[in-house]
């Protein structure tokens, strides 16, 4: 039998056979086991809030989870955009939720907004990288690992009633391949219903024309397909947030009180808050988590592994095992290491040669300087000797002249003394 036939048979997967059970086995409890394990482990959910300062991000979070999160008030004078994550442990019935709310503080407050999206992208990538590093550990513990990957980005749109700002389009375009984006119109009670309807159509048209991929509620699950399809048509959600309770009729409701009336947060005729809560928390929270892992994180992971040289197949679509990839990378690394060592050795040799040439040049310069100083010294010595000889000659000449002068002075003195004696002799005669 040919080798190709053997490979074909060895790689062929046998068709599974359907068998009937003679009695109860017990694996029908697997869903219950999974639920019990999940409840014991708890869940994590991470929300990124992007929007201008003062647009109502904190208020909406408080309204969504029916609690009050302790948050610092943001200033309008931030020099740059910074991400501020805060984690809370929540419990409803016997389900524990580790909720992380990440606020993009200072977004849209700078004069130069060209790079406003960069800190947000870097933060999302940093959470992906942290999870990837945990996965690549030899001794990893994903069960206990606190997953900080962003599961959903609530993008707060200013209710201008006209169109999206260029900053919004650029930012959402940069984020759509990294996170599930749900656009929402904040403070929807500031514009009329007719303006709001036109604004929604305008926003969706601009998102489509600019190729921005927002999160679509899944319709492949029959249990939620119908409601999700209906809710996809309501995007972006126009929301109003409030933690204040106002008495309407005989009951207290969360609402915003105005001189002209009351806007009820949970009244679907007033805003889309209930739709957002249903879609975000009660229906699609697990899908958002799954999409983050299977789509956005997998894209990041694949790109990172390809950068590291890992791939599933070669150019001929032949599958690579991890061992083959490791060996190929090891050979590549050793070859690169050898090349680097050779380059360093050659650089060292060249450096030694250059240093030797420099030392020889310095030695030659020093020798020339020494010879020059030696000649100067000899010339100075010759001049000194010549001066000394001239001085000795002048000294000898001076001494001779001095002796001659002294002799003349002695003779003159002697003659002067002899003259009076002669005169005395002449007088005596």
Curated annotation (Swiss-Prot):
Record PTM N-acetylalanine, positions in chain: 2
Annotated coiled-coil positions are 322-410
Q: Name one Pfam family in it.
A: Septin
The question of whether RNA-binding is a record keyword is answered with: no
Give the keywords, sorted. Answer: Acetylation, Cell projection, Coiled coil, Cytoplasm, Cytoplasmic vesicle, Cytoskeleton, GTP-binding, Membrane, Nucleotide-binding, Phosphoprotein, Synapse
| Sites bearing Phosphoserine, chain numbering | 10
Ranges for domain Septin-type G: 41-307
Protein localization: Cytoplasm; Cytoplasm, Cytoskeleton; Synapse; Cell projection, Axon
**Where in this protein does the record put region G4 motif?**
186-189
Biological function: Filament-forming cytoskeletal GTPase. May play a role in platelet secretion. Seems to participate in the process of SNARE complex formation in synaptic vesicles.
The family line of this record is: Belongs to the TRAFAC class TrmE-Era-EngA-EngB-Septin-like GTPase superfamily. Septin GTPase family.
Q: What is this protein called?
A: Septin-8
| UniProt gene name | SEPTIN8
């Amino acid at each position: 039998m040919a080798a190709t036939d053997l490979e074909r048979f060895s790689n062929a997967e046998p068709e599974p056979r359907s068998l009937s059970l003679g009695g109860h086995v017990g694996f029908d409890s697997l869903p219950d086991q999974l639920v019990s394990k999940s409840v014991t482990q708890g869940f994590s959910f991470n929300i990124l809030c992007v929007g201008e300062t003062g647009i109502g991000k904190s208020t909406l979070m408080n309204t969504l989870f029916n609690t009050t999160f302790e948050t610092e008030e943001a200033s309008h004078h931030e020099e740059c955009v910074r991400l501020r994550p805060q984690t809370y442990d929540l419990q409803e019935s016997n389900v524990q939720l580790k909720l992380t709310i990440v606020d993009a503080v200072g977004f849209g407050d700078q004069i130069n907004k060209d790079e406003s999206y960069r800190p947000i992208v870097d933060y999302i990538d940093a959470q992906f990288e942290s999870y990837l590093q945990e996965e690549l550990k030899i001794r990893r513990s994903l069960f206990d690992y606190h997953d900080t990957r962003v599961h959903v980005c609530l993008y707060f749109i200013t209710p201008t009633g006209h169109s999206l700002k260029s900053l919004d389009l650029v930012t959402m375009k940069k984020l759509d391949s990294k996170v599930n984006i749900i656009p929402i119109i904040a403070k929807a009670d500031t514009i009329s219903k007719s303006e709001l309807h036109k604004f929604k159509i305008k926003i969706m048209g601009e998102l489509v024309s600019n190729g921005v991929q927002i999160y679509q509620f899944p319709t492949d699950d029959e249990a939620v397909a119908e409601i999700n399809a209906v809710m996809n048509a309501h995007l972006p959600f126009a929301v109003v947030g409030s933690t204040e309770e106002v008495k309407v009729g005989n009951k207290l409701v969360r609402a915003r009180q105005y001189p002209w009336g009351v806007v009820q947060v949970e009244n679907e005729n007033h805003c889309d808050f209930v739709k957002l809560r249903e879609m975000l928390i009660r229906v699609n929270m697990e899908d958002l988590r799954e999409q983050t892992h299977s789509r956005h994180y997998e894209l990041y992971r694949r790109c990172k592994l390809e950068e590291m040289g890992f791939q599933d197949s070669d150019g001929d679509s032949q599958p690579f095992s991890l061992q083959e990839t490791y060996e190929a990378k090891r050979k590549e690394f050793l070859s690169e290491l050898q090349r680097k060592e050779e380059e360093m050795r050659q650089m060292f040799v060249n450096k030694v040669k250059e240093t030797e040439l420099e030392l020889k040049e310095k030695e030659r310069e020093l020798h020339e300087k020494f010879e020059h100083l030696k000649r100067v010294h000899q010339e100075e010595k010759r001049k000194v000797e010549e001066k000394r000889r001239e001085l000795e000659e002048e000294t000898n000449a001076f001494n001779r002249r001095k002796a001659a002068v002294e002799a003349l002075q002695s003779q003159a003195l002697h003659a002067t003394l002899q003259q009076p004696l002669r005169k005395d002799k002449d007088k005596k005669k």
